């Protein structure tokens, strides 16, 4: 049993805890603690009720020091439950990971992300750390599960799980490159609104993000091309990316265009994705040609879902694809996959 602590109980932290149970991985992963500055009542409420993902199928209760995940659904049930320690500490070095015998910290704060931050968790008693965002370049490894998780080694103690968008697009790039050879590419990320945007116009260091999230399509900076280069160094300076935020609360679409070496048709491209989704990337990549819209991919655990009806090929070598992902739920599930891969690499 892998003993895990979650540092930061926001969108990703709560989805990670929920995914432990909904994926069936509670047989392999035990969440022993959650560190979050918010009050226990709010933590329990937002875990139980979620605007994007609906009501959690497990009953949640709490006291001032614990969250309880009940195995039964009855409001008055006295049956079995899992107890999770609640902490409210802002300094990593004060966290009682040693006393709690924590094997792995899932750091979902989005604040910490360099080697020194990870080592602080380890000094506090954790054995390993997995960050929920790309983090700094000095980490022991960056894992996009399904693509390079087999590169994990026992000595990789401070690891990044990449970003939701790298987890979405990197597996597709891998498939296309292995099948046809990629020369270069561009990506437009069409991303749901996030909590770094404003409900109504208000001050922000990024002037575009001073504007109300629900009223505009808002261009934002992205370092996605750097994330691709970190996984595939051979694509240094070969990809560029832009990103816009749209007025939805969840699910992201990625418009991928690549120039390839092989002369192909649409069916060649789509069949390659289908084959990967049924074999090497099963559970990571999915494929559909159904006439779906973004909300249909809400709560989908795959990293990427290719909409084959939108695949286009120009002059045999320019390929355009539309790739969907639930930027919260898919990523949370990959956090768990990577966590178990880190354990297996011991």
From Swiss-Prot:
- Which keywords fit this entry according to its UniProt record? Cytoplasm, NAD, Oxidoreductase, Pyridoxine biosynthesis
EC numbers? 1.2.1.72
Reaction catalyzed? D-erythrose 4-phosphate + NAD(+) + H2O = 4-phospho-D-erythronate + NADH + 2 H(+)
Subcellular localization, as worded in the UniProt entry: Cytoplasm
Per UniProt, NAD(+) binds at 11-12, 327
Q: Name one GO biological process term.
A: pyridoxine biosynthetic process
Pathway noted in the entry: Cofactor biosynthesis; pyridoxine 5'-phosphate biosynthesis; pyridoxine 5'-phosphate from D-erythrose 4-phosphate: step 1/5
Q: Where is this site: Activates thiol group during catalysis?
A: 191
**Got a GO cellular component term for this one?**
cytoplasm
Q: Where is the secretion signal located?
A: none
Top EC class per UniProt?
A: oxidoreductase
Give GO MF terms, alphabetically. Answer: erythrose-4-phosphate dehydrogenase activity; NAD binding
Q: Where does substrate bind?
A: 163-165, 209, 222-223, 245
Domain of life (superkingdom): Bacteria
Entry annotation: catalytic residues: 164
Under the subunit heading, UniProt states: Homotetramer.
Record-stated family = Belongs to the glyceraldehyde-3-phosphate dehydrogenase family. Epd subfamily.
* Primary role: Catalyzes the NAD-dependent conversion of D-erythrose 4-phosphate to 4-phosphoerythronate.
Stated name of the protein: D-erythrose-4-phosphate dehydrogenase
Species of origin reads: Vibrio vulnificus (strain CMCP6)
